[in-house]
């Protein structure tokens, strides 16, 4: 959990990152190493060394692929734009970031200590995130006006989206 003092306003940003996942099990390699199908395969997948039908040790790394990365999710809101935020959310599969105002209202955004949609998109681009959803829109925007925020964000980060309350967003594994 990231909590940083930015311009005398406490800002909460959260990053949740899964641990790496085991590599994929290769049944063909297990058969070639004379490990019979069944409970021994499960033990190998759990990281245990097993004996094959010849009484030889077979190690998990002999039948498991490379570790696979977990997913990373970041959430940033109620803050002024700071380029350093990008480092905190770097490589996220999903960034949920406030985009309270359109570019024309940047002075008002600074005064109220919020970001524009373009500033949120700049963070997403600089952090090399996979996907970004905007949140925390100013109440001045009706549903018909929100696409303007999206358009400004997508000019910088094409994978920007608008999010809504109670919206479910899937974060798929990369592999």
PLM segments and residue spans:
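Active-site-proximal loop/helix segment associated with metal-binding centers of metalloenzymes
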Residues: 1-75, 79-88, 94-96
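Binuclear metal-ion centers of metallo-dependent hydrolases, dominated by the metallo-beta-lactamase
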Residues: 81-175
């Amino acid at each position: 959990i990231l909590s940083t003092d930015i311009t005398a306003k406490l800002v909460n940003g959260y990053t949740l990152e899964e641990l790496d996942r085991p590599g994929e099990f290769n049944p063909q390699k297990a058969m070639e190493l004379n490990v019979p199908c069944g409970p021994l395969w499960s033990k190998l997948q759990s990281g245990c060394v097993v004996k094959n039908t010849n009484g030889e040790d077979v190690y998990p790394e002999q039948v498991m692929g490379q570790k696979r990365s977990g997913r990373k999710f970041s959430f940033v809101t109620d803050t002024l734009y700071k380029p350093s935020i990008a480092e905190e959310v770097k490589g996220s599969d999903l960034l949920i970031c406030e985009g309270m105002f359109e570019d024309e209202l940047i002075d008002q955004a600074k005064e109220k200590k919020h970001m524009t949609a373009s500033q949120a998109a700049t963070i997403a681009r600089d952090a090399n995130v996979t996907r970004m959803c905007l949140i925390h829109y100013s109440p001045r925007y009706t549903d018909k006006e929100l696409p303007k925020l999206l358009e400004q964000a997508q000019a910088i980060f094409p994978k920007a989206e608008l999010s809504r309350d109670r919206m479910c967003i899937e974060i798929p594994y990369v592999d």
